[in-house]
Amino acid sequence: MGIKNLYKRGVMGLYGVAYAVAALAMTVTLDVSTVAAHGERSQEPFLRMRTVQWYDIKWGPEVTKVNENAKITGKFHLAEDWPRAAAQPDFSFFNVGSPSPVFVRLSTKINGHPWFISGPLQIGRDYEFEVNLRARIPGRHHMHAMLNVKDAGPIAGPGAWMNITGSWDDFTNPLKLLTGETIDSETFNLSNGIFWHVVWMSIGIFWIGVFTARPMFLPRSRVLLAYGDDLLMDPMDKKITWVLAILTLALVWGGYRYTENKHPYTVPIQAGQSKVAALPVAPNPVSIVITDANYDVPGRALRVTMEVTNNGDIPVTFGEFTTAGIRFINSTGRKYLDPQYPRELIAVGLNFDDESAIQPGQTKELKMEAKDALWEIQRLMALLGDPESRFGGLLMSWDAEGNRHINSIAGPVIPVFTKL
């Protein structure tokens, strides 16, 4: 293979790159609207209702300037009725769901302890989290707390809109190295990254161009079947292969040695586990046994029959049922509702057949109805098509002194088309 053929094949490879760039330019110029939020609705209801049960979540402040700090705090309960179809949280990582890195995460704490690598969490227990963020990209962004569970995937919590003002060009993220030098990680070694991208892409384009310029699959297959592979092996192919192999090894070795000399003090990627004890179990005088549950499809209502016992010394009243980040409340729950909680996740359709307080030592049957269009808007009615048709959530009650008691409830649910 002569120099002309080699040049021809390289040029044809560049043509392929030009076509790809043209296709990319067309996608950029087309008027395509971006997806802003609510991707969590695509998750299966059994993951959102019966795995991580979020509560007391706060986002703040609502408006943040570039380079200013924000925070997401809250708690979550790992449901006792964890579905068999999902891997258990033996290896979990607390994360933040956002549309690209619009914030920089400064720190994460679980129960007051740093949490920067994965670790085990205990089913049936509660955890408190705090995530500190720094505003990076201006805009209106939908932010979620999120728990990534190995083999189960990300489990997103409720989301709220957080606004960032200012200019992206003003963002800086200074970090102090072990050598005492301070760098801006937003722009540090940007030219170096571009250089290596260009180097490896150029080698790849040249390699592809060499072999795509010649006859492709069918002609080569016919030659191979008729005459063997000797005719397909060009001496120049072997030379090019050796040159690129040696060049690749030299670049890898040289780049490694250069990096070692320029940055002698490095911290390797951590491979351990974060182990944090769960929150202490709070005394709860309320016990609940689910006896029946159904979902009214046309009425968009979950109806649950339960047997409730108050083992305490103070009357208690139910006021909230929260599931998948949706808070169903009645007049009692409204008194304790956080006014900053996203309005699109609040439903006032929580009713009990007996709204009176449960007296100390009393056991009675209650029928709860959680009714709202949010069942369909949030795509939770799809639980009827899950491999385990079961519901789950947190039922909250308050006593006369304002103390809150939280019960995680779950049970099988059947669809109905008339009120039973």
UniProtKB/Swiss-Prot annotation:
Binds 2 copper ions per subunit. The two coppers forms a binuclear cluster. This is Ammonia monooxygenase beta subunit. Residues 1-25 form the signal peptide. The chain crosses the membrane at residues 193-213, 240-260. It comes from Nitrosomonas europaea (strain ATCC 19718 / CIP 103999 / KCTC 2705 / NBRC 14298). The keyword Cell membrane applies. Disruption phenotype: Cells lacking amoB1 grow more slowly than wild-type cells, while cells lacking amoB2 grow at rates similar to wild-type. GO terms for molecular function: ammonia monooxygenase activity; metal ion binding. It comes from the Bacteria. It holds the Pfam family Monooxygenase_B. Gene3D superfamilies: Helix hairpin bin, Particulate methane monooxygenase, b subunit. Chain: A, domain 1, Particulate methane monooxygenase, b subunit. Chain: A, domain 3. It catalyses: AH2 + NH4(+) + O2 = hydroxylamine + A + H2O + H(+). Its EC number is 1.14.99.39. Cu cation 2 binds at H142, H144. The soluble ammonia monooxygenase is a nonamer composed of three alpha subunits (AmoA), three beta subunits (AmoB) and three gamma subunits (Cytochrome c1 PetC). It is an enzyme of class 1 (oxidoreductase). Part of the ammonia monooxygenase complex, which catalyzes the oxidation of ammonia to hydroxylamine, the first reaction in the process of ammonia oxidation to nitrite. Keywords: Cell membrane, Copper, Cytoplasm, Membrane, Metal-binding, Monooxygenase, Oxidoreductase, Signal, Transmembrane, Transmembrane helix.
